[in-house]
Amino acid sequence: MKRRTAREKALQALFQIDVSDIAPNDAIEHALDGEKTDAFFEQLVYGVIEHQVQLDEMISGHLVNWKLDRIANVDRAILRLAVYEMVYSDDIPANVSLNEAIELAKRFGDDKAAKFVNGVLSNIKTDIES
């Protein structure tokens, strides 16, 4: 599975977990839709779940005039996924995670999602790199 596909499927699983409160294994199975699983995909899903509190704190600290629970569910899932990659995946450059998140926002979010995701993640990236 290509990494972009793994990210898309991880986003779908994380979104389902967030809005439906279903078990991660069920969300993963549904997102895979019969496809073979992938280590990167599972790392993303389980990593975000494991570190969600820290990820949410980091994201919340970079929101201007927003609260995390008021952000669109898909945007919140994209931010969690990208911040997880930026913080916990040493083999992925932060710019790649940021760009992939913007592409996910363009594909799955509304018209303003990509700009919003870019702004939040750019600030987080700056903090991580400093």
UniProtKB/Swiss-Prot annotation:
Query: What CDD domains has UniProt attached to this entry?
Result: Terminator_NusB
InterPro entries attached to this UniProt entry: NusB-like_sf, NusB_fam, NusB_RsmB_TIM44
Q: Which UniProt keywords apply?
A: RNA-binding, Transcription, Transcription antitermination, Transcription regulation
What are the recorded Gene Ontology BP terms?
Answer: DNA-templated transcription termination; transcription antitermination
GO molecular function terms listed in the Swiss-Prot or TrEMBL record: RNA binding
Where does the source fall among the domains of life?
Answer: Bacteria
Kindly list the GO CC terms recorded for this protein.
Answer: cytosol
Protein purpose: Involved in transcription antitermination. Required for transcription of ribosomal RNA (rRNA) genes. Binds specifically to the boxA antiterminator sequence of the ribosomal RNA (rrn) operons.
Give the HAMAP family listed for this entry.
NusB
- What family classification does the UniProt entry report for this protein? Belongs to the NusB family.
**Name of the protein described by the UniProt record:** Transcription antitermination protein NusB
- Provenance organism: Bacillus velezensis (strain DSM 23117 / BGSC 10A6 / LMG 26770 / FZB42)
